[in-house]
Amino acid sequence: MIIKPIASPARYFLRTPSWSAVAIFQAVKIKPLQLRTNSSNSVTPNLISPSKKSWKDLFSKRWQYYAEISRAGSPTGTYLLYSPCTWSILMAAYAYDSSLVNVTKMLALFGVGSFLMRSAGCVINDLWDRELDAKVERSKSRPLASGKLSVRQAISLLSVQLTASLGILLQLNPYTIKLGVASLVPVCIYPAMKRITYYPQVVLGLTFGYGAVMGWPALAGEACMNWSVVAPLYLSTISWIVLYDTIYAHQDKRDDVKANIYSTALRFGDNTKPVLCGLAALQIATLATAGIMNGQGPVFYTLGVAGAAYRLSSMIYKVDLDDPKDCFRWFKRNSNTGYLVAAAIALDWLAKSFIYDS
């Protein structure tokens, strides 16, 4: 007997009454292929694309938690910590006509140091606040608050970060090293301040603005330390930090009340915007004073001082303090204000070298 081959298995099943197309799909759990049109109006299969992997997926869960507690994926804090350092270094370069090589070296060292110390500060903050963070919606998923990392693991990470930071600090002159060691005091006590005072942002300002004190002597040396420039510059950075961190604190004001956490956002309340205007005026006035004492040129005032004044006034006018997302959006934009002032000082330095002194 000669057996004829079946032309098509699918055609055979479809000719069989018990194997309709619907039955086949149901039997093997296959969904009909969906079609979609692309921008050229041609029909293409809507195939399932593989899920996209982020850079975090390259590391184990523990390393992902280490990166999370260090805020490695949120660089805004590093930029804000770095900005006062750049202002001070570049102002010293303007005053003493420093070489580009030395300025670049200092900017690089302070850049790495800012990343390390900001990361270490976040770990210290989370160690202090792990119980409070669990009560706040925005922070309850942090590694320590959620139990993803243990206290011992966080302390081990902190030890590595502080050791690396010390390695950066030891590249500087002895006077700047002493200043750097002194900065650890506000770094360590800041998390406790939100438990006892409505003004923890002031302590944060002393901490985050400290680069304005260290940058100048790091480049110029102890003998050339000019407090008539550095002091108003430091006050300018403190005012700026209190301003933008008050906006940041408005994100959590409802949860903070429940958790007994204090902040300038709660202290100022409905009067926050008038206070922010006062802080902005103080920042701009002291920034201009530092420029006057340093003999800065017109580029600094037109781009740096006036530019910062415009950005701050625009932010204060537009930010919705009752919208957490809007508060965070405007908070992040302060890093651009820091870049603007740094660029103004750098361009003023170049103008002095090639235009003012020519």
Swiss-Prot record:
- Catalytic reactions of this protein: an all-trans-polyprenyl diphosphate + 4-hydroxybenzoate = a 4-hydroxy-3-(all-trans-polyprenyl)benzoate + diphosphate
Membrane topology qualifier:
Multi-pass membrane protein
Q: Which PROSITE patterns match?
A: UBIA
Q: Where's the transit peptide located?
A: 1-20
> Do the record's keywords include NADP?
no
* Broad enzyme group: transferase
* Keywords of the record: Isoprene biosynthesis, Membrane, Mitochondrion, Mitochondrion inner membrane, Transferase, Transit peptide, Transmembrane, Transmembrane helix, Ubiquinone biosynthesis
**Any stretches that span the bilayer, and where are they?**
76-96, 107-127, 154-174, 202-222, 229-249, 275-295, 336-356
Q: Which GO terms describe its molecular function?
A: 4-hydroxybenzoate polyprenyltransferase activity
Could you tell me the superkingdom of the organism this chain comes from?
A: Eukaryota
The family database entries (InterPro entries) matched by this protein are listed as: HB_polyprenyltransferase-like, Prenyltransferase, UbiA_prenyltransferase, UbiA_prenylTrfase_CS, UbiA_sf
| Main location group | mitochondrion
Q: So which cofactors does this thing need?
A: Mg(2+)
Q: In which pathway does it act?
A: Cofactor biosynthesis; ubiquinone biosynthesis
Q: Which GO terms describe its cellular component?
A: mitochondrial inner membrane; mitochondrion
The record's Gene Ontology biological-process terms are: isoprenoid biosynthetic process; ubiquinone biosynthetic process
Where in the cell?
Mitochondrion; Mitochondrion inner membrane
**Could you confirm whether the keyword Secreted appears in this record?**
no
Enzyme Commission (EC) number? 2.5.1.39
Q: Provide the function of this protein.
A: Catalyzes the prenylation of para-hydroxybenzoate (PHB) with an all-trans polyprenyl group. Mediates the second step in the final reaction sequence of coenzyme Q (CoQ) biosynthesis, which is the condensation of the polyisoprenoid side chain with PHB, generating the first membrane-bound Q intermediate.
Q: Which family does it belong to?
A: Belongs to the UbiA prenyltransferase family.
Instruction: Report the protein name in the record.
Output: 4-hydroxybenzoate polyprenyltransferase, mitochondrial
Protein source organism: Schizosaccharomyces pombe (strain 972 / ATCC 24843) (Fission yeast)
